[in-house]
Every structure is written in structure tokens, then in C-alpha cells.
Amino acid sequence: MSWGTELWDQFDSLDKHTQWGIDFLERYAKFVKERIEIEQNYAKQLRNLVKKYCPKRSSKDEEPRFTSCIAFFNILNELNDYAGQREVVAEEMAHRVYGELMRYAHDLKTERKMHLQEGRKAQQYLDMCWKQMDNSKKKFERECREAEKAQQSYERLDNDTNATKADVEKAKQQLNLRTHMADENKNEYAAQLQNFNGEQHKHFYVVIPQIYKQLQEMDERRTIKLSECYRGFADSERKVIPIISKCLEGMILAAKSVDERRDSQMVVDSFKSGFEPPGDFPFEDYSQHIYRTISDGTISAAKQESGKMDSKSTVGKAKGKLWLFGKKPKPQSPPLTPTSLFTSSTPNGSQFLTLSIEPVHYCMNEIKTGKPRIPSFRSLKRGVSLIMGPALEDFSHLPPEQRRKKLQQRIDELNRGLQKEADQKEALNKMKDVYEKNPQMGDPGSLQPKLAETMNNIDRLRMEIHKNEAWLSEVEGKTGIRGDRRHSSDINHLVTQGRESPEGSYTDDANQEVRGPPQQHGHHSEFDDEFEDDDPLPAIGHCKAIYPFDGHNEGTLAMKEGEVLYIIEEDKGDGWTRARRQNGEEGYVPTTYIDVTLEKSSKGS
């Protein structure tokens, strides 16, 4: 089967067919392009979906901890990888299918144009040969008619008796001329006819079959290319199936990793306050006064008894006690609320805390019907934190258990930072030793600012660790003695009809009012008085600052390079020395930043 022999006379049909083939190729390329756009949009939408539901972590505290959340975020990661595979499919189709189709379509157009031009040229050449043959034929026919006319004229004059011999001779010459020209045109026509027949045979049996064969091969290559692109279209999808299967397996593994018991334990770890549940309220017997009155038989005895009890209650007013959930309400405010339980001043301006029986009934109802008020203990700190407000730096606004965890996490982070700075200091010292031994490698003095900065960071981190460890010890100490305090409070209930709260606040008897000592400054706790020194510590030596120290942290003393200070307390092994300026300002400075000179008496001691 060959187009050259079977379709030798269908040039126009082959022209239309090859054009349709290229149009079909371009249409399929357009289909692939739209499929690529769909894959790209699908991948983009998947990535936007993952980005929308992924956690926006601004700190480590917001990292997911529950297994269900971690599993969901793992699924999002796998879905993000799946979106990446859809992008791979789009890229593969764009490179192997769409790009190849567009290049091949361009080549086909060029090749088709060339073959059709060759066919048209061959046809034009054959038409030219036919015109030459036709012209020679017409000329031969015309000369033959002229020769025939000349012969008739000669015969007519030759038979005419009146014609002269000259006329006959002239007609004979004309006949011979026309006959000669007819013979020449006959030979020309025969030659042109033979040439045309040869060219026509060559055209239909050699040239046209060759051109049509090339067109046929071109069209078959187009069909093969379409088949390859169909296969590449499917292969682009099939190549990513193993990776997509792994993504789906990862989602299944994430689903299997969900542990409900572990999540429940995390809830406990996250919200456990460390407080103990409130103890039982003691029975307060108010009827004993009535029974005493009846037994005495006089009303005056009851009055005297009540007077004695009132005098006893005034003695207890010297003890500072706090109500369980806040301040005692003012007498002129009938509706009780949690925020109106405190009375904070006396006529002379001193501040104190009072308590009456009405808040007891209110709090009993709150405990039974309202939501738990235990979180209100978070801000209690030795009975004064309700006035001072929460201290965020030491996490005192958190319950003991949560505060302990936060402090431990901070200490661990500070220890890691301290280890990093220590490693950097060691590396700088080694580099400094190398520079000192080999000056051509560098200037040892250039490392001094970096060493000073590193030492400053080390001292700062040590002080932070020391401060947080002190807070942690405070929390652990309170947690350790809470059971003993609870036991002692139960004994006090039996003796004084009172009750101690989990953080050291107290409730009072049924009809007694207990007032604490007046506070001159509401924003200062009793800790300030415990650490105030009446007399300044004596100087045991002096020191000179080798490096400057900024002293931004609380309790530190800023100093300039070369400044002379008094030593009032030696280094206890924590890297800090207590110093004082001449103006009396005191604070701690890094021991490694100063040159210490102690007096002989202090050295001997």
C-alpha cells in the first residue's frame, strides 16, 4: 500500500489530510496544556489548604503535643508531599508531552510545506511540457493547412491554360516552401510530444510517488508521535504512583499513631495545678450560747458570755488572714459577688482584711453550684499577691505544678545556652592560643571583644539560672510541705473553729471578724522587709574592673573599665562578687571581670 501508486491523482485530498493531521496534533497539545493547568491549580489549592490548616507557631509553647493534633499535622505534611507529586505530574507532562508535541507540530508544518511545494513544482513542470507540446502541435497543424492551400493553388494554376509559366513556377515554389515548413513543424511536434510523454511518465511514476511517499511517512510519524505522547501522558501519572502510595501510607500511619490515653495524660500534665482539694468545713455550733443561757437561768449571763467571746475575738484580730476567694464585702453592699469580698481600709487610712459569716454561705453556694474557684489561688503569694498582681517573670501567676514545669523548661534552655557559650569561649581561647603561637595567622587582640562578650553572656546566663533555680526551689518547697500544712490546718479547725486555705489564707469563725495588721504600702510584700539590711556591710577589700559590665539584670551593678569598687562579699563559687561604689550603690559583678585585692584580715579569716 502506497500513496504514490494508489493516490497518484489525489494531490488536493492529501493536502487536506496532512493539514487535518497537524491540526489534530495541535488540538491534542492544547488538551495536554489544559490538563497541566488543572494539575497545577490542583497542587496549588492543596498547598493553600495545607498552609491554611497548618499551625502558625510563634513560640515553642504553641507546638502541637496531643497525638491527635500531631497525626493531623503529619497528614497535612503528607498531603503537601502529595501536592508536590501533582506538580511533578504537571512538569513531566509539560516537558515530555506538551513541549514535544509543540516542537513536533512545528517540524511537521515545515516538512509538509516542503513536500507540497515539491509536488506543485513537479506539476508545474509537467504543465509546461504539455504547453510546449501543444504549441508545437498547433504550429504543425497550421503549417500543414498552409501547405495544403499552397498545393491547391499550384494545381489550379497548373491546370489553367491561361496561367503564365511564371505564375505556375511561383506557385510551385510556394508549395515547396510550405511543405518544407510543415515537415519541420512535424518533426518539432514529434520531439515535443516524445519529451512530454517522457516527463509525464516520470511525473506519475517517479516524482509524484516519491513525494507522496514522503507525505505518507510524515503522516505515519505523526501518528507514532501521538501514540508516544499518549503513553507519556499515562507514564507521567504512573511514575508518581509509588510516591503517592507512600504518602497515603504515611497518612494511615499517622492515623494509627493517635493514642487517646496519652492525650488524656497530656491534659493532666497541662492543667494540673498541684493544689489539693478543699477540706471539709468544720461544724460551727452557735447553739452553745443558748444552752449556756438556759443553764445559767439569766439573760445577763448570756450577755456576759457573749461579751467575753467578743473580747476574745478582738485578740484574734491581730492576725492577718485572707478570705478563701477574695476580700470581704463592704457592709453596705447587700448583693455578694466574688469581687466585693474585701474591705481594704479603716477610718485612719490603714489597710486590712475582714471576714464575716455572709461570705461563708456565698462561697458554699459557689462551691456547690458555680464553677470551681481553685484557679483564684494562682495569684496568692503569702497573702499579698492579690494586691500586687501577677509576676510573669517567675510564673507566679501559674499554679504550682505548671509553674514548676515552666521554670524547669526555662532552666533547661538556659543550661543549653550556657553550654553553647562555654563551647564558644573554649573555641575562642584555643584560637587565641594559636594566634599567640603563630602571629602570622591573626591578631590575638582581635578576639578580646568577642571573648568579653562571651564571658558577659556566660555570667548573665549563670545569674539567670541561679535566679530560676531559686524560684524552682521555692515552688518545690511549697509543694513538699503542703501536706503538713493541710494536717496542721485540720488541727486548728478543732481548736479555733478556723480553716487555712491551701496557700496560707484563713477563714474565721461564724460571727467573728478578724483583721490583719495595717499595711503602709499596698505594693510591697513582706519579702521586702525580710531582706532589708539596717547597716551596710563592711568592705573586705577592693577591686578594679578589667572589662566593662552593663549590669542590665536585676541585682547587678554596672561598672566601667578601670573603675575601683569596694568588695563587701566574696565569690561563693557561683562566679559573682558583691561590690559597692563610694556613693553606696551595691550589686553583683562578674568575678572574671575584676581584679580583686582583699585585706589581710579578710584573707586570714
From Swiss-Prot:
List each copy of the F-BAR domain by range: 1-263
Q: Which GO terms describe its biological process?
A: autophagy; cilium assembly; endocytosis; signal transduction
Instruction: Return the annotated region ranges for Interaction with DNM1.
Output: 522-605
Q: Where does the record place the modification Phosphoserine?
A: 295, 488, 501, 505
Signal peptide range in chain numbering: none
Segments carrying the region annotation (Disordered) are 482-538
Q: Where is this region: Interaction with DNM2 and WASL?
A: 541-597
Question: Could you tell me the membrane topology recorded for this protein?
Answer: Peripheral membrane protein
Where does it reside? Cytoplasm; Cytoplasm, Cytoskeleton; Cytoplasm, Cell cortex; Cytoplasmic vesicle
Question: Which keywords label this protein?
Answer: Autophagy, Cell membrane, Coiled coil, Cytoplasm, Cytoplasmic vesicle, Cytoskeleton, Endocytosis, Lipid-binding, Membrane, Phosphoprotein, SH3 domain
Q: Which GO terms describe its cellular component?
A: cell cortex; cytoplasm; cytoplasmic vesicle; cytoskeleton; plasma membrane
Coiled-coil positions are 66-258, 392-484
Question: What InterPro entries does the entry give?
Answer: AH/BAR_dom_sf (IPR027267), F_BAR (IPR031160), FCH_dom (IPR001060), FNBP1L_F-BAR (IPR035494), FNBP1L_SH3 (IPR035493), HR1_rho-bd (IPR011072), SH3-like_dom_sf (IPR036028), SH3_domain (IPR001452)
Chief location category: cytoplasm
Q: Where is this site: Mediates end-to-end attachment of dimers?
A: 165
Residue stretches of biased makeup (Acidic residues): 527-536
- Show the segment(s) annotated as Interaction with DAAM1, DIAPH1 and DIAPH2: 541-605
Quaternary structure per UniProt?
A: Homodimerizes, the dimers can polymerize end-to-end to form filamentous structures. Interacts with GTP-bound CDC42. Interacts with DAAM1, DIAPH1, DIAPH2, DNM1, DNM2 and WASL/N-WASP. Interacts with ATG3. Interacts (via SH3 domain) with ABI1, WASF2, CDC42 and WIPF1.
The role this protein plays is: Required to coordinate membrane tubulation with reorganization of the actin cytoskeleton during endocytosis. May bind to lipids such as phosphatidylinositol 4,5-bisphosphate and phosphatidylserine and promote membrane invagination and the formation of tubules. Also promotes CDC42-induced actin polymerization by activating the WASL-WASPIP complex, the predominant form of WASL/N-WASP in cells. Actin polymerization may promote the fission of membrane tubules to form endocytic vesicles. Essential for autophagy of intracellular bacterial pathogens.
Q: Which PANTHER family match?
A: FCH AND DOUBLE SH3 DOMAINS PROTEIN (PTHR15735), FORMIN-BINDING PROTEIN 1-LIKE (PTHR15735:SF14)
The family line of this record is: Belongs to the FNBP1 family.
Record protein name field: Formin-binding protein 1-like
Give the classification, highest ranks: Eukaryota, Metazoa, Chordata, Craniata, Vertebrata
